Amino acid sequence: MGKTVINCKPYFKAATPQGHPQSWIVPDLCKAYNWPANLAGGGVIAIVELDGGWVQSDMDSYFQSIGQPNPQITDVSVDGTANNPNQHLGDPRDPDYEVAMDIQVAAAAYFVATGQPATIRVYWAQDIASAVQAATADGCDVCSISWGADEALWGVDAAQQMEAAAAAATAAGMVVFAASGDNDSSDGGPTPANVDLPSSCPHMIGCGGTNKTATTETVWNDEPGETSGEGTGGGFSTIFPVQPFQAGAPNGPGRMVPDVAADADPMTGYTLFTHGAEVTGEGGTSAVAPLYAGLFAAFGTKLGFVSPTLWSNQLCFNDITQGDNGAYRAEPGPDPCSGLGSPIGTKLANLLATSDAQASAAGV
């Protein structure tokens, strides 16, 4: 069966100037999430991109500004698609911002956990499944996907192709994270409840969004300074059935999304570097997938289909109990707004890192 190319969109958002965003630098956000340190690392991070590009000078400026060494970044053209920056200047959906966010967040999060520069391979392709297959063939350890579209736009055949690629990736030991979308529970669709794909694939870890301050964390939904209808994606798949590993999930007609969450609200967003300038208030669930990818790459082992382990260890996450994404409200325990919650980095490291990495983190 040939590949189906879906018109996917990048899931980054920017706060409007009147929004006065509070902006995190990644090392400080990692500290707020109790990131581990001195892990063994060694994991290779795959990042999937469908458009846009990056330039070295932006990376130099960003990593110098946060006191980290540059990561090792390799571009991989899967089907002729290539790193092609500065083609959408002035477009509010300029995908260069997506590419910068993915690389900068993943690499910075990895360095905080390991003290080592990250190794990143950026896979350029017209369709996500082909990029995931290429990353699997290359032996990458984790994969971050910040592009997607409403399940209805994919249809069953393309969704099954995507899930097959994800299942093969996890069978080879790769963990795959995917943004759950930025248009609340509707996912920009015609009804109040639609989920985003590929995050709804059972072998992906769907990544939802929160509003994270120094003292509070709630579900990300639109606020003053944001466009109406913005907020974390989440809900229940109409293509993939209920998953046995999602113990404790609310009753629904299909696989629940997201599995996990972290800061995504542009009003509590990220400080990054793109087009020769520092930018603040960058957000979207696009930031959450690379944040987790950076952490999991630090664990020093091929975890593969790790979702059942995460769902069996819910105390490794900060439960988000306030807020909604339109059709669904946060509640104690897993919910279709924030999944299991936001990461407690040290607990996840104790659960998942290799014994050598755990010993290093403990100073043994």
Task: Report residues per predicted region.
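N-terminal low-complexity, intrinsically disordered patches enriched in charged
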Residues: 217, 293, 348-350
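Substrate-binding/charge-relay-adjacent region of secreted/lumenal peptidase catalytic domains
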Residues: 1-209, 233-284, 300-308, 344-354
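C-terminal substrate/ligand-recognition segments
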Residues: 283-297
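Acidic/polar loop patches that form or flank catalytic/metal-binding clefts of enzymes
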Residues: 206-208, 214-219, 302-313, 317-318, ...
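An often Trp-containing, charged/polar helix-loop segment at the C-terminal end
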Residues: 293-336, 340, 344, 356
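Low-complexity, Gly/Ser/Thr/Pro-rich intrinsically disordered linker/tail segments
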Residues: 333, 352-364
